[in-house]
């Protein structure tokens, strides 16, 4: 597994498109979420994702600085492609680590 952490301006168009496809498949199609999937918060986020050994997306999370969607740093859009194998836990652990180390977060809101 490879962990990738990129800010919006570091993502290629292909990477961002792939992340949006995954998010839409899970949150809009599968979970029928009524919330807008593409928003301006993406531009402020650190996008974290795991790729498996074949290069496919295995997990994703979006980490936001304080003041973007909440008064505190926040973690949202969490996806584990394969469920029941610990990827959700791994991506959350990494998201918390990034929020603490990169954003100096003492308090983190989970969306």
Where do the model's predicted regions map?
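Residue-level signal for beta-strand positions within conserved beta-sheet cores that form or flank
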Residues: 1, 71, 106
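Short amphipathic alpha-helix that is part of the acyltransferase structural core
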Residues: 1-35, 39-44, 51-56
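Conserved, charge-rich beta-strand/loop surface module that forms ligand/interface-binding patches
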Residues: 30, 66-68
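Conserved beta-strand in the GNAT
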Residues: 49, 56-65, 72-79
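Conserved acetyl-CoA-binding loop-helix of GNAT-fold acetyltransferases
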Residues: 80, 85-98
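Conserved GNAT acetyl-CoA-binding A-motif
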Residues: 99-111
């Amino acid at each position: 597994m490879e962990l990738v952490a990129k800010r919006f301006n570091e993502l290629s168009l292909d990477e961002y498109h792939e992340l949006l496809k995954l998010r839409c498949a899970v949150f809009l199609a599968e979970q029928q979420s009524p919330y807008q999937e593409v928003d301006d918060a993406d531009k402020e986020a650190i996008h974290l994702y795991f790729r498996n050994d074949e290069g496919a997306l295995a997990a994703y999370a979006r980490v936001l600085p304080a003041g973007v969607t909440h008064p505190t740093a926040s973690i949202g859009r969490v996806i584990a492609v394969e469920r029941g194998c610990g990827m959700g836990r791994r991506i959350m652990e990494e998201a918390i680590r990034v929020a603490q180390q990169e954003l100096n977060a003492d308090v983190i809101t989970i969306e």
